Amino acid sequence: NVTARMRSPYVKVFEEERELTVVLLVDVSRSRLFGTVGTSRKDMLAEIAAVLSFSAIINNDKVGALFFSDKVEKFIPPKKGRSHLLHIIREIIEFEPSSDGTDISEALRYLTNAIKKKCAAFLLSDMLDVNKDGSPRYEEALKVAVNRHDLSVIEVFDPRERSIPNVG
């Protein structure tokens, strides 16, 4: 016994190695091009996605991406590796959607169907997907996705949207 030989408690520390799957759900609708203070939402989305992706790669996790507008535009299956990560970031910067609208429910449904095992998912959006009365259209799909995956919502907005400037 090591503790008896050393005459002090011997503690062995193990670090859990787990391979998470990280999926970025990126809103590529027309509204992402808006921006008044320095950068557009598109630039902010790319920066946030890059930070999350690099963090995942450092932890040896798989990273995938799902681009959506009012439909799923593109799905990049989760993989490991720096070249895969750079491919995702390049796609976020250069991708041109075929539709203008936003349907968060469609993206969440696709996520729950495409990724069977529990994953860490990040929804990067301006969350401008509401009914005429202002209620979110994605509420039910969000509940289903949260039950299956660890879902974090990162709302990207322009400061001008929160406070309308007094122009007279």
Give, region by region, the residue ranges found by the protein language model.
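Non-catalytic regulatory/linker segments of enzymes
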Residues: 63, 83-84
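Short, flexible, mixed-charge acidic loops at enzyme active sites
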Residues: 79-82, 166-168
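An amphipathic, basic-hydrophobic helix/alpha-beta surface used to engage anionic
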Residues: 1-78, 120, 125, 132, ...
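Short, conserved clusters of charged catalytic residues that mark active-site
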Residues: 48, 103-106, 136-137
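Von Willebrand factor
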Residues: 84-119, 131-132, 158
